[in-house]
Amino acid sequence: MTEIYIVRHCEAQGNLKRLFQGVSDFDITETGAKQLEYLKKRFENIHLDKIYASPLIRTRKTALAVAGGRDIEIKDEPGIIELNGGVVEGKPFKETFNSIPGLAETWDNHPEDFAPPQGEKMRDAYERIWNTVKRIAVENSGKTVALATHGGITRCLMCRLLNGDITKLASTPW
């Protein structure tokens, strides 16, 4: 049986500052560094054949913690990178979302229709992550792997697994 562990990155600077991080390359905070230690301990007795990481510093550091110094291949996987926020990238959630008509309401109540200007549509990210995870599962049949990824991507994946329908994204927990 193939096993896939899904790990959201530890706290990053953008989380602390309440920014839309998206594909911006924010580093881990001091709290995030402590979380990395807990994560290392949590995975120390779990056999992993490979770890896939979104190619951002916060997920790479998370993947290294999951590996815990063991000789486990860590592979950059762009298919599990966070949603590209376009014009909202790296900006404060509240102020930015409220400055673009309809964006905050869509994010809160109909996230499946979220499509920031110059960014990635949520529906595209939803399909991207699902296709990536299916490919990884096939490539690692019978193995155990971990994915170091992001909150939005994890939520999309959980929605797909639990509900099978992106229209249920608003009711899918983070």
Residue positions per predicted region:
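Short, hydrophobic/glycine-enriched beta-strand segments
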Residues: E3-H9, L147
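Phosphate-handling substructures
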Residues: G69-W130, A170
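Short, active-site-adjacent cap segments at secondary-structure transitions
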Residues: Q13, R58-R60, E82-N84, I153-R155
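Active-site metal-binding loops of divalent metal-dependent hydrolases
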Residues: C10, T144, G151
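Active-site-proximal alpha-helix that buttresses catalytic centers in soluble enzyme cores
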Residues: V7, E11-I72
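Glycine-rich phosphate-binding loop signature in dinucleotide/nucleotide-binding domains
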Residues: E44-H47, I136-K143
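Domain-level recognition of soluble alpha/beta enzyme cores
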Residues: D165-W174
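Short beta-strand scaffold positions
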Residues: A53-S54, E127, A148-T149
